[in-house]
């Protein structure tokens, strides 16, 4: 049955596409995102281009991919019968940012833009980075997100991570994920930096609680491909029902 939603998505095919962009070109968009920062280890920047009815083209958003937030993420997705990772580091990307101009979402023909762009992004990564097999993405529960747009694109949901204590860079206003982030302050290890945060009021760090994040994955070859079936069979975590936002009283 042809639905209104399917007609809207069909219309997007003629008016929306992705185009490679430089870091400088996406920064203006990233600064408007709620995270307010440009991610590290970026591999691919794409502008979301909208061809208007008058023929002019506007950049209405950006989608950014790169290495995973946690360097060991690739080892924690799927394993073979002997417990060896089915994926190598270069075979896993993370969708690091997706930002769309608020005014673009008000255009009737772009009402399904976010989910459509994610689908375009997966196809673009498969085309431009053929070695990549899996794209992971996270929804920040601390921001009240459940990943509704990923659910709309049939992403595989692998659950929510636990709340953890993490180092926070006070000057930059961001979490510490990599050793080089503490080394620039003269610390050799994360443990040294954590001890400094606990005992030194003037430490560049403080220890905060990082709320767990909802994790989703996309298998770029499709779940019905031989590769997709192999990854599905080896998933370390069970596939779970999609989370929903609590209903307000």
Where are these regions (language model features)?
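Short, cationic low-complexity segments
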Residues: 229-249
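Short amphipathic alpha-helix that is part of the acyltransferase structural core
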Residues: 6-42
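Conserved beta-hairpin
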Residues: 30, 42-67
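Short hydrophobic/aromatic beta-strand or adjacent loop that forms the aromatic wall/cage
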Residues: 43, 211-216
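Short beta-strand-to-coil "C-cap" segments at the C-terminal boundary of structured domains/repeats
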Residues: 217-222
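Charge-dense, intrinsically disordered terminal/linker segments
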Residues: 1-14, 224-226, 244-249
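Acyl-donor binding region in acyl/amide transferases
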Residues: 19-20, 67-206
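A positional "C-terminalness" feature that preferentially activates on distal terminal regions of long
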Residues: 15-16, 209, 238, 246
